[in-house]
């Protein structure tokens, strides 16, 4: 229960419950809650509590009932945690635990709660590092639902093999550096998504060369449900149930994924995506919710095989309990946080809260494939076979920025000849290595609690260097302008941070301009934006996107890399030190890559009424011959940049100008 002047929010299938005492029949929101969602309750001051299962995630849940001792006060309730009624039996000596974590700040409390579950998982799992996963660390091309080539669309080609080979060639000729390609389910023998796949053998009409490395690229591969009539039924142990569209199953034999992943990695698989997770539990089958072992055994076997073969996992269409259980699955680095990006519905609106929830549990939130074309440019012949067959994308800047800043997979999905290279290169180096933020995109605390912004979709990603934070802020469907202050960005995570910052609007294809100074006493305003009305037939922007940077001790501001979503990506800048005399940066890049670093040397004049911030651009080019190599065989060089108010910024390949010791752990994270 809460006081009437305090708001209450919670995660419930991406639903915000609102104020506890103002939700009619509020108990109906919770009764029968069988999806395993954690409950986040908070007041307007940010005092928060998270309650969830701490074990047996597949078969546990919550319920609520009114407190009959006080029938007139609908703000009182009795909350229950326990096992689901879907269980048909419980073993002797069975134990179940729940956990309650309380703290100050919504982001901070969720992270503390996630730390607890990761520890209780007993597998030593840490939060994902975006540069420890080949797929997350590199630009890719995707063919799943919403992609141009979904369902094997290949107008003008004899088959999909020919289409993808030509696509690869065309992107190479355009210097668009994709490093892997995702195959969805359209190439394999199946009986549809449900009841599922029959085999992992390609249909000859799609891939004449069969299951082989004919493409010559690393692959992200996929499985929907598994049909109970698949070719492996007599070779491995399965749990099978009947659904209206036929029998469906999950493998319980540890050898199944060992053999499947051995085959996949033989042709270049670097990631395996398990889709339709929601259908295995509360959805069509109940395969994982009728006993206490099946779900655990199924995903544990998948994880052990992934570890054995050095690949990572993506969960797709998960319920909340799959995400909680992912704290025990070492190989899962990301999970889908939206519906399929078919441009038909506003599924991207869930990215803020899900980004926060997912990362608290150790994984990154994925928002699916993206198109890069300009507004209303039709991609003729696309494979979007959903009802409205939308073959255009008018929200590309929002989709692409969110996909990159969330730290989930960034997979372009345009048809050949449609890809906007300018937009794509906001994401990565010239060799296709991604430039990501250290902290992924997530809802900010004040969007839950503060009366002037409550309910606003305001998300931010961050890069931190010591006490200095650079933020990338996105507002979606804002009905009013939202005030932003330095403390609203820091959220108590950094002590001694600068209280004066600058901000500018991010506009694709344009350099940094229109820089404004803001502070605690003089906030900047995130402008209001239009709703995501479909089919996006509106002239005004559906989102607002600001970048923000601190004023450093010498009065300068390093705005960061021009024309990148993460202007100060920790994948580019491995060291920054700021003193009252100078700012020193160590940066890494691909051979012969040129970067543009925007900075301001005159912010100390900010109190002058006539002050107009001046932006300077420093252009640096990395050597053509680099000698260092990262874990993915990417060559890279280092450049040092020194900035002083009087002389501006200058770059050098000479290590002698670097007076700062490199932090080993930061260097290791990107290499």
Put a short name on every predicted segment:
Residues 1-180, 198-206, 218, 271:
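Carbohydrate-recognition beta-sandwich/jelly-roll modules
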Residues 403-411, 448-500, 504, 543-553, ...:
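Carbohydrate-binding surface patches
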Residues 492-511, 600-624:
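Solvent-exposed beta-hairpin/edge-strand motifs
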Residues 518-574, 593-597, 625-671:
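C-terminal beta-strand-rich structural cap/linker in extracellular carbohydrate-active enzymes
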Residues 11-15, 26-27, 172-409, 414-417, ...:
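Aromatic- and carboxylate-enriched substrate-binding clefts and catalytic-loop regions
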Residues 132-134, 161, 169, 418-435, ...:
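Short linear, low-complexity motifs centered on an aromatic residue
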């Amino acid at each position: 229960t809460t006081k009437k002047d305090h708001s209450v929010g919670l995660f419930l299938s991406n639903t915000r419950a609102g104020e506890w005492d103002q939700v009619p029949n509020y108990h109906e929101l919770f009764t029968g809650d069988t999806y395993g969602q954690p409950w986040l309750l908070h007041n307007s001051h940010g005092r928060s509590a998270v309650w969830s299962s701490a074990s047996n995630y597949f078969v546990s849940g919550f319920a609520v009932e009114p407190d009959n001792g006080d029938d007139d006060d609908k703000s009182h309730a009795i909350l229950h945690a326990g096992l689901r009624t879907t269980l048909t039996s419980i073993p002797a000596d069975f134990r179940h635990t729940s956990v309650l974590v309380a703290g100050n700040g919504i982001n901070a409390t969720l992270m503390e709660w996630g730390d607890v579950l990761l520890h209780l998982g007993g597998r030593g799992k840490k939060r994902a590092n975006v540069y420890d996963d080949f797929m997350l660390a590199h630009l890719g091309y995707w063919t799943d639902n919403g992609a141009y080539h979904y369902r094997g669309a290949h107008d003008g080609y004899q088959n999909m093999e020919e289409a993808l080979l030509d696509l690869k060639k065309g992107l190479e000729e355009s210097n668009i550096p994709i490093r892997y390609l995702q195959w969805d389910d359209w190439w394999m023998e199946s009986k549809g998504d449900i009841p599922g796949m029959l085999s992992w053998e390609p249909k000859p009409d799609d891939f004449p060369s069969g299951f082989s490395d004919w493409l010559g690229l690393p692959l992200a591969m996929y499985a929907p449900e598994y049909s109970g009539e698949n070719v492996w039924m007599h070779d491995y142990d399965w749990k099978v149930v009947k659904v209206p569209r036929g029998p469906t199953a999950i493998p319980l034999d540890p050898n199944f994924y060992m053999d499947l992943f051995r085959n996949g990695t033989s042709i270049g698989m670097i990631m395996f995506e398990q889709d339709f997770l929601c259908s295995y539990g509360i959805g069509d089958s109940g395969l994982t919710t009728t006993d206490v072992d099946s779900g655990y055994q199924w995903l544990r076997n998948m994880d052990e095989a992934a570890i054995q073969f050095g690949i990572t996992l993506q969960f797709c269409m998960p319920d909340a309990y799959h995400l909680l259980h992912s704290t025990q699955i070492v190989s899962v680095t990301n999970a889908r946080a939206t519906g399929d990006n078919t441009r038909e519905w506003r599924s991207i609106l869930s990215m803020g809260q899900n980004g926060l929830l997912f990362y608290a549990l150790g994984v990154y939130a994925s928002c699916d494939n993206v198109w890069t074309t300009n507004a209303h440019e039709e991609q003729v012949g696309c494979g979007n076979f959903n009802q409205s067959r939308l073959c255009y994308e008018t929200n590309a800047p929002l989709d692409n920025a969110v996909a990159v800043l969330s730290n989930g997979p960034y997979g372009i999905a345009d048809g050949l000849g449609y890809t906007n290279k300018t937009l794509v290169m906001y994401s990565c180096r010239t060799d296709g290595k991604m430039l990501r933020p250290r902290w992924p995109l997530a809802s900010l605390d004040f969007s839950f609690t503060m009366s002037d912004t409550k309910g606003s979709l305001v998300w931010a990603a961050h890069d931190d260097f010591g006490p200095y934070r650079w933020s990338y802020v996105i507002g979606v469907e804002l009905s009013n302008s939202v005030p932003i202050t330095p403390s609203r960005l820091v959220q108590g995570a950094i002590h001694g941070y600068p209280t004066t910052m600058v901000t500018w609007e991010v506009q694709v294809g344009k350099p940094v301009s229109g820089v404004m100074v803001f502070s605690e006493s003089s906030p900047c305003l995130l402008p209001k934006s239009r709703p995501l009305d479909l089919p996006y037939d509106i002239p005004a922007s559906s989102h607002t996107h600001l970048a923000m940077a601190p004023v450093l001790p010498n009065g300068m501001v390093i705005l960061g890399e021009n024309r990148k979503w993460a202007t100060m990506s920790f994948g580019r800048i491995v060291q920054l030190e700021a003193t009252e005399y100078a700012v020193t940066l160590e940066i890494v890049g691909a051979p012969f890559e040129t970067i543009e670093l925007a900075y301001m040397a005159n912010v100390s004049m900010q109190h002058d009424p006539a002050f107009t911030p001046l932006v300077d651009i420093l252009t640096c080019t990395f050597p053509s011959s680099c000698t260092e190599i990262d874990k993915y065989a990417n060559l890279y060089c280092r450049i040092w940049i020194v900035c002083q108010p009087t002389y501006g910024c200058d770059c050098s390949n000479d290590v002698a100008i670097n007076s700062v010791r490199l932090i080993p752990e930061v260097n290791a994270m990107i290499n």
